[in-house]
């Protein structure tokens, strides 16, 4: 079994590859500010199985020093990344597409269904993860009354999280992130917030929005192939203009 204690703290070793940086980042990931009443944080990186699965996944696909484009979702949900610790990767996709067995209940998450359809069309996990790194504006997820909560759903939560979001983003840039463009999942509030943050921090040359996978699966399911093509076209454009 792989433990986060096996990995050094961020930036402590110039010989760290992309996977080492990711796993060291997860090792220290926590929220120290007080959350609004009733809001609970999802921290899968404190669970032994999630820690082991993250180690297997990131060592399989990120054991190099290649630069990658960053894709930012909103925050993990309780049925996907909130369980496995891997963004948009539920236990079923982790086993079926990535070949990493696990004992979690094999439930599908809608967003993961779309993401892995797109990854499959791109050429498979190995090719996709060699060029892209998926995270979220808030790399930790939230629930309230047992339901998923977005960081922007509660104004007080968004305000409390700002320093955590900025600190997390800056740490992830050290992994080897390409800053010419960042892809944002969501064309509404997530895109607006990320643009405002980028105007303040001046990190990326451009933020490119993509329809959120959950929106596609809930409201445009019959057009999945169209949206897969939209993703692939925007990714190809970014790679070709690099």
Language-model segments: residues:
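Short beta-strand scaffold positions
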Residues: 184-185
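Intrinsic-disorder-associated, low-complexity terminal segments enriched in Asp/Asn/His/Tyr and depleted
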Residues: 6-9
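Charge-dense polyanion-binding interfaces
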Residues: 241-242
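A polyanion-binding, active-site-adjacent surface
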Residues: 3-4, 14-181, 191-196, 201, ...
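Short hydrophobic/aromatic-enriched beta-strand-loop microsegments
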Residues: 202-211
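Short, charged, surface-exposed secondary-structure boundary motifs
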Residues: 212-223
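Catalytic core of Fe(II)/2-oxoglutarate
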Residues: 188
């Amino acid at each position: 079994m792989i433990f986060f204690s096996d990995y050094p703290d961020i930036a402590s070793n110039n010989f760290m590859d992309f996977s080492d940086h990711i796993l060291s980042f997860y090792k220290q990931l926590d929220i120290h500010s007080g959350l609004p009443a009733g809001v609970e944080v999802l921290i899968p990186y404190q669970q032994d199985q999630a820690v082991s699965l993250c180690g297997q996944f990131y060592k399989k696909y990120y054991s190099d020093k290649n630069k990658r484009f960053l894709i930012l979702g909103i925050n993990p949900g309780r049925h996907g990344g909130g369980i496995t610790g891997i963004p948009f990767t539920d236990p079923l996709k982790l086993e079926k597409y990535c070949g990493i067995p696990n004992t979690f209940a094999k439930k599908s998450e809608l967003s993961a269904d779309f993401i892995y359809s797109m990854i499959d069309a791109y050429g498979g996990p190995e090719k996709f993860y060699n060029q892209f790194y998926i995270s979220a504006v808030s790399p930790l997820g939230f629930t309230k009354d047992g339901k998923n909560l977005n960081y922007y759903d509660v104004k007080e939560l968004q305000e409390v999280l700002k320093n955590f979001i900025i600190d997390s983003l800056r740490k992830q840039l050290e992994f080897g992130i390409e800053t010419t463009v960042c892809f944002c999942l969501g064309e509404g509030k997530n895109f607006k917030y990320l643009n405002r943050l980028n105007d303040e921090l001046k990190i990326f040359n451009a933020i490119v929005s993509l329809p959120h996978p959950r929106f596609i699966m809930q409201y445009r399911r019959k057009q999945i192939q169209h949206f897969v093509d939209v993703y692939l076209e925007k990714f190809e454009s970014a790679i070709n203009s690099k």
